[in-house]
Amino acid sequence: FTLGDVQVEPFAISHDAAEPCGYRMRADGKSVAVATDLGIYDDYIIEHLKDVNAILLEANHDIHMLEVGPYPYPLKQRVMGNKGHLSNELSGRLLCDILHDNLKSVMLGHLSKENNYAELAYETVKLEVTLGDNPYKGDEIPLAVASRDHRSDIITV
């Protein structure tokens, strides 16, 4: 569908909600995506994200913090399950699969208040990129973390 000059392309995601989706928006030869509540990712997700210029990408939890944290066991299993949320590590691996020279902004978002914190998400994703099978290193990517309490800076692509 379109909103003014913006083409909005919803794509199906794996999450325990009714018809969950991510979004890719295109205008003037540029594209941005919102990819949260992923649960898991696969080639279908990669295909929808692979050449975006900016992305809001879920980095919901640190696996160890979730495992030892206050959530009841069934909730921990749901969060870590295929219809839950992406861990910091999986977010970094997904980022490795979609990195390209024209990706100008990666904003990590949807961080769990109980099972993550901004610095840990940032460093874990950066490390996954550095160790990943791609030509980029963590310091070379335009990575930031969205604040839970304040709006982020405006990003131009």
Model-found features: residue ranges?
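Cofactor-binding loop segments of dinucleotide-utilizing enzymes, especially the Rossmann-like FAD-
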Residues: 37, 111, 148
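Residues at the C-termini of beta-strands that transition into short coil/loop
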Residues: 12-14, 58, 147-149
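Short, basic/aromatic-enriched C-terminal tail that caps enzymatic domains
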Residues: 141-157
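Core dinuclear metal-dependent hydrolase active-site scaffold
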Residues: 1-54, 154-157
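Short, active-site-adjacent cap segments at secondary-structure transitions
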Residues: 1, 113-116, 151-153
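A broadly conserved detector of short glycine/acidic/proline-rich loop/turn motifs that flank catalytic sites
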Residues: 29, 61, 149
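Cap/insert and terminal regions of metallo-dependent hydrolase folds
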Residues: 43-145
